[in-house]
Each structure stands twice: as structure tokens, then as C-alpha cells.
């Protein structure tokens, strides 16, 4: 019961208490003095000032203003104290007697009123007397004012047995009230609309606003001296106290109900509430009646009025709905879909949004009593919830009614935005910002209506029970702030990002970019159509870009029969217009499968076809390539290097038959820690070694058959027996397990690890069998020529999928090159292997020699922090090599590597150079590149300072070379050139992302 007691009663200052006690005495004697109502009014005004100054606090008001406020406040306080003292001198009654008389009369009153109201309700129910909507509204105003007049009169007179003069005065007041209420409500609404339009015209003119506020204040003060001031103050009290207005605003947003249903429900509700009342409450209210105009009285009045006004509202809301859409477009733009009167709509100023988190939390708790009152009531009264069917129906009606306005508002360019707005609304407040933006309809989503989060539920009773007067004031000041806030659209958008919290974290498909989300939600949130600002331009450009992406997507879909097209209507999904990463992955995977089916035996034929396209002139370029090859392979720390027939290996006796060299039986490990492999031996009692594949920095690899698995072929990688290599081997084992667990269906083209074991103190890893690596493929089929564009496209798709999996597992491979990419027998499927250099993305130690040199990204060379971009760079270099058969950057040193990269892309950005730890090795103090080369004659190092480096290497010419390409292939080569340009950006921040690469035309469009 204590929860229903408004905390405002507790919060009011002491002098208010004294003031109120004086008033209750006057009420008992049936005399309501002029200065009392004036007093009441001035108190009301004082509070209002207080509230405004609270808001102005955020607006950095000047010292003069503050002093003025202070003086004003003190003047009122002094005035009040004097009045209170005078009044208390006049009165001589003991407080105890006063209370008893007052409260007995009140209780008696209330009982009789309840009986009267019930009878009235029953009569109305029987007769169903009210028909027309306008009549209803008028009647609502009349009956409301009548009740108010009567009830206040009774409360003031104390007993029913008081003199006749008081009743006549009551009648006069009733008529007075009727007229004044009508006139005042009309004039006020007019004033408000005029006020609002004025303020919109003079955006940012705060001084003007202040003057207006002062003017309106003085007017009200003048009014308070007029004879009808008593009825006015009553009317104001009614406005703030009765929940009917609050309910009406709720009804506007809510659904129209049948009046009959409404009456029955209201009766039931009335009964329940009456039953709940207990003597304890009355006891408590008795004590409180000294301090305020008996809150029990007010509460009961409001309850009765609430039940009576329900049936009026149901029809009234219909009429309001009809009227509202006829507002001016500008008004619509500002108020969004929620067309309420300004005093009633809880808006949020941008200032509120940019509060500190703590303040924001507090203000959120205390803010919008209306909204929360409505929420708490909805959750508490089951009678108020509609069936989902009816709710949906009325919602669709509402939407139809709103559609023409939206069309009128949106210019042709902003139409996609409207679609998305519609979609956002349908997605039931998918973005957390929706909750706070004034342009959103608040009680639209059925989810919110049905249930509230426990936090909000626990908070709402506190918010609900706020003093009616303060509620009224806060509502007014909020509307004032909202009007001002329109001039600060830009600020609102900037500050909104601070409030943002990811409510639906993980609901989007993985890999979806955060930037895309925020741009589709944030920028489209509440967009002023009139303002053509920076945000609008950016937004339109984004939409145009998306349209281009869509165009490519549909082109791809036309040729891609195997993949079902994504629903194209923007309303069908809450995602951004571009296809989701998962859809892209599916499409690419399907492409790879199709390529595998179609090209089982065509690999060699396609390579020969490419050879035939080349002209005879090519031969003179091959000698240079041969010179580079040894350098390339000395760098090779590959587990499958096709180099195992070297003199060193033969000298070590590796690969010889077991019987030929029986001395090796006891000596399993050579001087460098490599395992001495013997053909025919059995490892771990099950793997029968039948062939030797090769040797890398960390290990050597053998082919074997698994006796335990029906002689299934496997590859066994035997790690070198030394501490560092063992450590590296265990790390690789960990990463492989992680990758395999993340890809149970083997869609992402990373090598599968079957198991591991130890053999003669060597860690052995058992892999799926694959025939050769891409270095061998290039050597065998595409020496100096490269592979067919079809094969390169398929390989690039598979490599990007592998990168996608690595990123999901937060792993950097850090050694991608043709040597570490294995292919199957038909050369259609590839797998990324050798995770010996891999690391977790967070453990990226800065070292200038990470990754094989030709595939090393510039950020590694200059010692800048790096991430997934280094693997993307390596893939770019590999793709170029696969198509041309030539190494893209065959640098002899890191310095030479930088020079070659800048020959292709121009000078490295200064911003990037400054971040490099090793920048001084390659750049001088003015950030000019120092090219270090060896003089051919003197064989001494010479340094050439290059302030500007212009791109001289033509990628397209290198890709096409001397080929006479048919049109379809030429188009694909142009696309490959475009993709490589984006992959090989010197600044990793500007480099293409994996998702973008998967959406690139080269990947998406078939040949």
C-alpha cells in the first residue's frame, strides 16, 4: 500500500507543509481566500522555475541569469513565510479536531460519490447514450469539469451539512468551469502550435525563447489574478493529476477498443480497486491530509474519472487518429510517427543524450513518467492487453494511414531510407537507440507491451508515483527542450553513438561489419528531410554504393543457378541490403564444388590452352626467371618442398632402401635433429611408410598407409628433435585442432589433422594425404606462364575461405605462399597447410623477418603492428604468381622489397611510416625513402634518397603479357587486376577485407 503513496509528498519542503496546513483549515471553514489560490499558483510557478533552471544547468546559463533566479526564489520564499504566519495567526483550531472533522467528512463523501458514479455508469451502459465522436469529446470536457467542480467544492466545504451559500458558489463555479475549460483548452492548443512553429523558424535563438517564456509567464500571472483563477488552478491540477490524459495519449498509440467492452472492464476494475482499499490507507491518508489536498481524495477521484473516461477515450482516439495525419509535413518530420500534443509527448533533448553514463542512468530512471506510467499500467492490468490478432490488425491500419505521409516526405533519393525505416519499425526495436529516439512510436512493439525486463519492472513503480504537479512541469519543459533540440540534429547524431549499447549482440550473422550496422541504423534513425547536411550526403553515397554491389550480386545470381537468390525486398530481412557473409560463403563453396565436378580431368588441358595463347616472344624472359628460382627456394621453409632430391639429402642417406644401409638402424636422428626416414618401416605400429615427400625447416614428411584404417593413405609429418622445434610442433598441433573443430564439415580449406603420436622422441602429426603443393604445380604445368584464369579464380575462392576460418579462430598463418598450399590429385581442391609459423592475433611480436620474404607485407618490414592483413597481402602475391608464373616482388632484401612495392603502389603514406619501429632503416628524418643498392662495379652499398616514388609497374600489362585473350577471359583478367590492386594496398587499414574480397566481381562472376 505504501508504494502507491506518491514520493512527491515526501520530497516537498517544510514550508509547503505549513502552507498546506493553512489551506486545509480554510477548506474546513468553507472559505477559500483569494491569496490562498494565488499562493498555490505562485508555488506552482516557483516549482516550474526550479525545473527549468535544472535543465538550463546543462545549457551553461550566464551568472546573471542564475542570480536573477536565486533572487526570485528567495522573494517567493519570504512572501510565503509571511502569508503562512498571518494565516496561522488567524486560525485558532486545534490540529487534532481539524483532522477528525475533515477526514470523517471526506470518507462519507467518497462513499456517496462511489455509489453515484456506479449508478451513472450503469445508466450509461444501459442506455448507450453517446453516439457522435465530437459530442463525446465535448461531453468529456463538460462532465470532467462538472465532477471537478463538485468534488473540489465538497472537499472544500468539509461537511455535507454546510451552508447553502457554498453550494450556490459550487454551481456558479461549475458553469464557470465549463466555459473557461473549453476556452482555455482551445487557446492553449493554439498557443502551443504557434509557439512550436515559431521556435522551429528561429532555430538556435535561445534568447528569443527565453523572452517568450517570460512573456507567457507574465500572462499566466495576470490570469491568476482574474476571478476565474480558482477554477483555473483546479483545471491545471486536473490536467496533471488525472491519468485520463496520460491514458489518452496511450490510447492514441494503442488500439481502438469497443466502448461496450471498455465499460464492462472499467466496472470490473473499479470493483477490484474498491475492494483493495483498506482502513489502513485511510488512517495514513488522514495524517497526510494536513500536508496536501488529501491524496486519497485525489487518487479516488482519478480512479473514478479513469474508469468513466475509458469509454469516451476509445471513440475519441479514433477521431484523434483521423485528425492527426492532416498536420503539416514539417511537423510530421519533426515529430515522427507519434503525433501527440507537445505537452504530452515525452521527447528527449540531445543534451540528455550526451550526459555522463551515471547521470544518464539517473535521468533515465526519473525521466518520462508518462511512458513508464503507461508501461507499468499495461503490465499490471490484464484487461488492457489486446489479442495479438486485433493488435496486428490495428497496427496495419495505422501503417496504411501513415504510408502516404512518408511518401510525401521522402524525395526520390531518400526512398530507400523509408523502406529501411519501415523495416526497423517492423523489427520490433532491433536497435537500442530506437528506445530513446523521439521519432519512434513507443508502445508499438507487442513485445514491449507484453513484458518488461525485470530491471524496468522494478523501476517503474518509482517512476510512476511522482507528484502530479512536477510531472506536468517536467512535461512542459521537456517539450520546450525538444523544440530547441531540432536545431541540433548533427549533435544528436554524434552523441547518440555514446549511448549505443549492443542490445542484440550476436544476433547478426558472424562477420557482419559493425560499421555497416551503425550506418544502416544510426544514420537512418531520425533524419530531418529539410536539412541537407553532411550526414545526408554520406548516407546517399552509401546507398548508391550498395546499389552497385546489388547490381553485381544479381549479375552473379543470373549465372549462378546452383545458389538460391536472397530475398530482394528490403522488408523481408532486418539486415543491410548487401548479402550476408554466410550467404556469400555458401555461394563461394557451391562454386568451388561445381568447379571440382566440371574440371576433374581438364586441368592439364586448360594449362595447355593457356600455353597456346602465349607468343614465341615469351622465351627470352624465361632466363631471368631461372636465375631467381634458386633464391626463392633457399628461403623455402616448407614442409613439402619439392627439393628433396638434393645432394645434401642423398649424402644423409635419406630415401635409400632399408637393407642398403643397416648402420642407420640404431641412429634415428641426424646431426640437425631430422628423423632418418626408412622406406618400409612402421610408425606407431600402424603407419607403413612407402614414400618420402620432402623436408622443411621444422620437419620432414613421409607418405604412409594406415594399417588400422584399411590401408588408407596418410601424410606423416615428423618434427625435428630439438627443443625449439618440438615447441613449434606442439603450437601447430594446437592451432590445427582449433581450426578443425571450428570447421567440422571441412568447408574452409585448411588441412585436416587426423591424430598425433611420438616416435623415437619425435612428435609426429598425421594428416590427410594430398598430392603436391602449388609450387610443384607451377613448376610442372605453368612454368613462366602460370595457370588458367578459371583455376586461379577457384583457387582464390578457396584461399579466401581459408582466411575466413583463420580470422574466426583469431589465428594468423604468417607464412602463406604457393609452397604451403597443397592440392588434390585432380588439382581442383586446395588446402592451406604448415601452421608452424602461425600465431594468435594478439601475440604478434614485431619482427622484420616474419613470413617468407617475397610474400612479406610492408607493415612487417617497417616494424608496424600487424593483423589479418599480412595474410591477405601474401594471398595477393600468391594469386599474381599463380596466374603469371612469376614472383610479384622478388626482392633481395627488405629494403628492396619496399622499393618494389612502392614501384607498384607509389610512396608509402607518412602516417604509416611514422608508426614503424624499423622506419629509420629505410627512411630518413624527412620520411624520404633511402634505397640501398649494391654498385655493380665497385660492389659497395650506395644509398639513393627518393623523396617521391611514382608507380611505374603496370599490373595489367604484366597479367596479360603477350596473351591473345578472348573477351570473356580478358574481362576476368581486368577483374583480377582490380582485386589485386585492392589487396596490395600499402596501408593495411585500406586493404580489402575478407568479406569484401569474397563479394568481389572476380570471385562472384563466373566465366
UniProtKB/Swiss-Prot annotation:
Q: Which residues carry this modification: Phosphoserine?
A: 8, 21, 24, 33, 88, 94, 132, 143, 145, 167, 240, 242, 258, 278, 292, 294, 328, 354, 356, 366, 368, 387, 427, 431, 437, 518-520, 565, 569, 576, 578, 580, 852
Every copy of the Protein kinase domain together lies at 687-1003
EC number(s) reported in the record: 2.7.11.1
Task: Please provide the Gene Ontology terms (biological process) for this protein.
Answer: mRNA cis splicing, via spliceosome; positive regulation of hippo signaling; positive regulation of protein export from nucleus; regulation of mitotic cell cycle spindle assembly checkpoint; spliceosomal snRNP assembly; spliceosomal tri-snRNP complex assembly
Report where the covalent cross-link Glycyl lysine isopeptide (Lys-Gly) (interchain with G-Cter in SUMO1) sits: 118
PTM annotation (Phosphothreonine): residues? 385
- One Pfam entry name: Pkinase
Q: Which GO terms describe its cellular component?
A: catalytic step 2 spliceosome; chromosome; kinetochore; nuclear speck; nucleus
Instruction: Give the domain of life.
Output: Eukaryota
Where in or outside the cell? Nucleus; Chromosome, Centromere, Kinetochore
Q: Could you state what the record's PTM comment says about this protein?
A: Phosphorylated by CLK1. Autophosphorylated; phosphorylation inhibits interaction with its targets, such as PRPF6 or SMARCA4.
| Bias-annotated ranges (Low complexity) | 158-169, 562-581
Quote the SMART domains the UniProt record gives.
S_TKc (SM00220)
EC category name? transferase
Q: Where is this cross-link: Glycyl lysine isopeptide (Lys-Gly) (interchain with G-Cter in SUMO2)?
A: 100, 112, 118, 171, 178, 593, 659
* Residues binding ATP: 693-701, 717
Chief place of localization: nucleus
Q: Which residues carry this modification: Phosphotyrosine?
A: 141, 849
Report biased composition (Basic and acidic residues) as residue ranges: 83-92, 248-271, 294-303, 316-325, 395-408, 415-429
> Which chemical reaction does it catalyze?
L-seryl-[protein] + ATP = O-phospho-L-seryl-[protein] + ADP + H(+); L-threonyl-[protein] + ATP = O-phospho-L-threonyl-[protein] + ADP + H(+)
Sorted UniProt keywords = Acetylation, ATP-binding, Centromere, Chromosome, Isopeptide bond, Kinase, Kinetochore, mRNA processing, mRNA splicing, Nucleotide-binding, Nucleus, Phosphoprotein, Serine/threonine-protein kinase, Spliceosome, Transferase, Ubl conjugation
How is the subunit organization of this protein annotated in UniProt? Interacts with CLK1 C-terminus. Associates with the U5 snRNP and NCOR1 deacetylase complexes. Identified in the spliceosome C complex.
Q: Which protein, by its recorded name, is this?
A: Serine/threonine-protein kinase PRP4 homolog
- Source species: Rattus norvegicus (Rat)
**Gene name, Swiss-Prot/TrEMBL:** Prp4k
Amino acid at each position: 500500500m505504501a508504494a502507491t503513496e506518491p514520493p512527491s509528498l515526501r520530497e516537498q519542503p517544510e514550508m509547503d507543509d505549513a502552507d498546506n496546513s493553512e489551506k486545509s483549515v480554510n477548506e474546513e471553514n468553507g472559505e477559500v481566500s483569494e491569496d490562498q489560490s494565488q499562493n498555490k499558483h505562485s508555488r506552482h510557478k516557483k516549482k516550474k522555475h526550479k525545473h527549468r533552471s535544472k535543465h538550463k544547468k546543462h545549457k551553461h546559463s550566464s551568472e546573471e541569469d542564475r542570480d536573477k533566479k536565486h533572487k526570485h526564489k528567495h522573494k517567493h520564499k519570504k512572501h510565503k513565510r509571511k502569508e503562512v504566519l498571518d494565516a496561522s495567526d488567524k486560525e485558532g483550531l486545534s490540529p487534532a479536531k481539524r483532522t477528525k472533522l475533515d477526514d470523517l467528512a471526506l470518507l462519507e463523501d467518497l462513499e456517496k460519490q462511489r455509489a453515484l458514479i456506479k449508478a451513472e455508469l450503469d445508466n450509461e451502459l444501459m442506455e448507450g447514450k453517446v453516439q457522435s465522436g465530437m459530442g463525446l469529446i465535448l461531453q468529456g470536457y463538460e462532465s470532467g469539469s462538472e465532477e471537478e467542480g463538485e468534488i473540489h467544492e465538497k472537499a472544500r466545504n468539509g461537511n455535507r451539512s454546510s451552508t447553502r451559500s457554498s453550494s450556490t458558489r459550487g454551481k456558479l463555479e461549475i458553469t464557470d468551469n465549463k466555459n473557461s475549460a473549453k476556452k482555455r483548452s482551445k487557446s492553449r492548443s493554439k498557443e502551443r502550435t504557434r509557439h512550436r512553429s515559431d521556435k522551429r523558424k528561429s532555430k538556435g535563438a535561445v534568447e528569443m525563447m527565453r523572452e517568450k517564456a517570460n512573456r507567457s509567464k507574465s500572462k499566466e500571472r495576470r490570469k491568476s489574478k482574474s476571478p476565474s483563477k480558482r477554477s483555473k488552478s483546479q483545471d491545471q491540477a486536473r490536467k496533471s493529476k488525472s491519468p485520463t490524459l496520460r491514458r489518452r495519449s496511450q490510447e492514441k498509440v494503442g488500439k481502438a477498443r469497443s466502448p461496450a467492452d471498455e465499460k464492462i472492464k472499467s466496472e470490473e476494475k473499479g470493483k477490484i480497486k474498491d475492494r483493495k482499499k483498506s482502513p489502513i490507507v485511510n488512517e495514513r491518508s488522514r495524517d497526510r491530509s494536513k500536508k496536501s489536498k488529501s491524496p486519497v481524495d485525489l487518487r479516488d477521484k482519478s480512479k473514478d474519472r479513469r474508469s468513466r473516461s475509458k469509454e469516451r477515450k476509445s471513440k475519441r482516439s479514433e477521431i484523434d487518429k483521423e485528425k492527426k495525419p492532416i498536420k503539416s509535413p514539417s511537423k510530421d518530420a519533426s515529430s515522427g510517427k507519434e503525433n501527440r500534443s507537445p505537452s504530452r509527448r515525452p521527447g528527449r533533448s540531445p543534451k540528455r543524450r550526451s550526459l555522463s553514463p551515471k547521470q544518464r542512468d539517473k535521468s533515465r530512471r526519473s525521466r518520462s513518467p508518462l511512458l513508464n506510467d503507461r508501461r507499468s499500467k499495461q503490465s499490471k492490468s490484464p484487461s488492457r492487453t489486446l489479442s495479438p490478432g486485433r493488435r496486428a490488425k490495428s497496427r496495419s491500419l495505422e501503417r496504411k494511414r501513415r504510408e502516404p505521409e512518408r511518401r510525401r516526405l521522402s524525395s526520390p533519393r531518400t526512398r530507400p531510407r523509408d523502406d529501411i525505416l519501415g523495416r526497423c519499425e517492423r523489427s520490433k526495436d532491433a536497435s537500442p537507440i530506437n528506445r530513446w529516439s523521439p521519432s519512434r512510436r513507443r508502445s508499438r512493439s507487442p513485445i514491449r507491451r507484453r513484458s518488461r525486463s525485470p530491471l524496468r519492472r522494478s523501476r517503474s513503480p518509482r517512476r510512476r508515483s511522482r507528484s502530479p504537479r512536477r510531472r506536468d512541469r517536467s512535461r512542459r519543459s521537456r517539450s520546450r527542450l525538444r523544440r530547441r533540440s531540432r536545431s541540433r540534429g548533427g549533435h544528436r547524431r554524434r552523441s547518440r553513438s555514446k549511448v549505443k549499447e549492443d542490445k542484440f549482440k550476436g544476433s547478426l550473422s558472424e562477420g557482419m561489419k559493425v560499421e555497416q550496422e551503425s550506418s544502416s541504423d544510426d544514420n537512418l534513425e531520425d533524419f530531418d528531410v529539410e536539412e541537407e547536411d553532411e550526414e545526408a550526403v554520406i548516407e546517399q553515397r552509401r546507398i548508391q554504393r550498395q546499389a552497385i554491389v546489388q547490381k553485381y550480386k544479381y549479375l552473379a545470381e543470373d549465372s549462378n543457378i546452383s545458389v538460391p537468390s536472397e530475398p530482394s525486398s528490403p522488408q523481408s530481412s532486418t539486415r543491410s541490403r548487401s548479402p550476408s557473409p554466410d550467404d556469400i560463403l555458401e555461394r563461394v563453396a557451391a562454386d568451388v564444388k561445381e568447379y571440382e565436378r566440371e574440371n576433374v580431368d581438364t586441368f592439364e588441358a586448360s594449362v595447355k590452352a593457356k600455353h597456346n595463347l602465349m607468343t614465341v616472344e615469351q622465351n627470352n624472359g624465361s632466363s631471368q626467371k631461372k636465375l631467381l628460382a634458386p633464391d626463392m627456394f633457399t628461403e623455402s621453409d616448407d614442409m613439402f618442398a619439392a627439393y628433396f632430391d638434393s645432394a645434401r639429402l642423398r649424402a644423409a642417406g635419406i630415401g635409400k632402401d632399408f637393407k642398403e644401409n643397416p648402420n642407420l638402424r640404431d641412429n634415428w636422428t641426424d646431426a640437425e635433429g631430422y628423423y632418418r626416414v626408412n622406406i618400409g618401416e612402421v610408425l606407431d605400429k600402424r603407419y607403413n611408410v612407402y614414400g618420402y615427400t620432402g623436408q622443411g625447416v621444422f620437419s620432414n614428411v613421409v607418405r604412409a598407409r594406415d594399417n588400422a584404417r584399411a590401408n588408407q593413405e596418410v601424410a606423416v609429418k615428423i618434427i625435428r628433435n630439438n627443443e625449439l622445434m618440438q615447441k613449434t610442433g606442439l603450437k601447430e598441433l594446437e592451432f590445427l585442432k582449433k581450426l578443425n573443430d571450428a570447421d567440422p564439415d571441412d568447408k574452409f580449406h585448411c588441412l585436416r589433422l587426423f591424430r598425433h603420436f611420438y616416435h623415437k622422441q619425435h612428435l609426429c602429426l598425421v594428416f590427410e594425404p594430398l598430392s603436391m603443393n602449388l609450387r610443384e604445380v607451377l613448376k610442372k604445368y605453368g612454368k613462366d606462364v602460370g595457370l588458367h584464369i578459371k583455376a586461379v579464380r577457384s583457387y582464390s575462392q578457396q584461399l579466401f575461405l581459408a582466411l575466413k576460418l583463420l580470422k574466426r579462430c583469431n589465428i594468423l598463418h604468417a607464412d602463406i605462399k604457393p609452397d604451403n598450399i597443397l592440392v588434390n590429385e585432380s588439382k581442383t581442391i586446395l588446402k592451406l597447410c604448415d601452421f608452424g609459423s602461425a600465431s594468435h592475433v594478439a601475440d604478434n611480436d614485431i619482427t622484420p623477418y616474419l613470413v617468407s620474404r617475397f610474400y612479406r607485407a610492408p607493415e612487417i618490414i617497417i616494424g608496424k603492428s600487424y593483423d589479418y592483413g599480412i595474410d591477405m597481402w601474401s594471398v595477393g602475391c600468391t594469386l599474381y604468381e599463380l596466374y603469371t608464373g612469376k614472383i610479384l616482388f622478388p626482392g633481395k632484401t627488405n629494403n628492396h622489397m619496399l622499393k618494389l612495392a612502392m614501384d607498384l603502389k607509389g610512396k608509402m603514406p607518412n602516417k604509416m611510416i611514422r608508426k614503424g619501429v624499423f622506419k629509420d632503416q629505410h627512411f630518413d628524418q624527412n620520411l624520404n625513402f633511402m634505397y640501398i643498392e649494391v654498385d655493380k662495379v665497385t660492389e659497395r652499398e650506395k644509398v639513393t634518397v627518393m623523396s617521391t616514388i611514382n608507380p611505374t609497374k603496370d599490373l595489367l600489362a604484366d597479367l596479360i603479357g603477350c596473351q591473345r585473350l578472348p573477351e570473356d577471359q580478358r574481362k576476368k583478367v581486368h577483374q583480377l587486376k582490380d582485386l589485386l590492386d585492392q589487396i596490395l594496398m600499402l596501408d593495411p587499414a585500406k586493404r580489402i577485407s575478407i568479406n569484401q574480397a569474397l563479394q568481389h566481381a572476380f570471385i562472384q562472376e563466373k566465366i
